[in-house]
């Protein structure tokens, strides 16, 4: 099973959308079905979302409805050179974002509902309008019924058991016809979304200080160079002597 083979740090470090999706699916969390694609001919029926396998910030995310367009995009754009995924487009779905911190105690922010101008929550919505991500249009806290809010928090807690992330980070969800799906995790600088905490009496400086304190409190691994000169191997004449 992938959960026993792929470390969570790999998933986070490389921003691998397919690995994250697979980890979530294997652990029973609701996800939108994703498929890896290549340059071979695709038979697509309906609207799909095309994404680079790696990266974030909605760069390279396209709404598509035919295989020929997908082929042209992944063949002619470097954004998909390391792979691409497609997922079914959920019309009228709602994006929901929540911040999480792991220090000094596990805590979650308010839930945000971004107010997008386009069909998808685009790079323009996030970064180019109203002074960037912090100034983009939003509903904070999101006007959600208690059941959806409770379900989202439960999912956050379960994801954190699967991926024990440190620091401050953000989870992105999609809500479609009262069904909630985990979309992705954002751990890169700029995606911390510190504004999510502004109504909870946590300033940016306090949040950043807590990240530094957490980093300083972590155990440091001290590596030794003993044996790296290869003398032991050079003196061994055969496999038997190496094994003792």
Question: Model-predicted segments: where are they?
Answer:
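Short glycine/proline- and charge-enriched loop/turn segments
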Residues: 8, 129-135, 186-191
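ATP-dependent carboxylate activation and anion-phosphoryl transfer catalytic cores
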Residues: 145-244
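Phosphate-binding site of ATP-dependent enzymes
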Residues: 66-139, 143-147, 175, 180
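Active-site nucleotide/adenylate-binding loops and adjacent lid/helix of ATP-dependent enzymes
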Residues: 13-93, 153
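Single conserved hydrophobic/aromatic residue that forms the stacking wall/gate
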Residues: 1-7, 11-12
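Short small-residue beta-strand/loop micro-motif enriched in glycine and branched aliphatics
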Residues: 57-59, 135, 191-195
């Amino acid at each position: 099973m992938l959960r026993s083979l792929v470390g969570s740090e790999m998933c986070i470090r490389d921003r691998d959308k397919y690995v994250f999706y697979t980890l979530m699916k294997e652990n029973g969390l609701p996800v939108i079905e994703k498929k890896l694609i290549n340059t071979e001919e695709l038979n697509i029926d309906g609207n799909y979302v095309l994404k680079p396998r790696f990266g974030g910030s909605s760069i390279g995310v396209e709404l598509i409805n035919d295989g020929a367009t997908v082929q042209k995009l992944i063949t002619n754009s470097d954004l998909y050179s390391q792979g691409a995924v497609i997922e079914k487009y959920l019309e009228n779905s709602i994006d929901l974002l929540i911040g999480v911190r792991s220090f000094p105690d596990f805590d979650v922010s308010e839930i945000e509902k971004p107010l997008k101008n386009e069909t998808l929550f685009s790079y323009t919505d996030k970064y180019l309008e109203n002074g960037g991500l912090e100034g983009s249009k939003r509903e904070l806290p999101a006007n959600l019924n208690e059941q959806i809010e409770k379900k989202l928090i439960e999912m956050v807690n379960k994801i954190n058991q699967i991926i024990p992330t440190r620091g401050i980070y953000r989870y992105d969800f999609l809500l479609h016809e009262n069904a909630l799906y985990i979309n992705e995790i954002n751990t890169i600088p700029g995606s911390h979304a510190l504004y999510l905490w502004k109504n909870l009496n946590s300033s940016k400086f306090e949040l950043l200080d807590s990240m530094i304190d957490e980093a300083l409190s972590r155990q440091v691994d001290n590596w030794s160079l003993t044996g790296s000169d290869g003398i032991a191997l050079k003196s061994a004449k055969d496999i038997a002597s190496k094994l003792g």
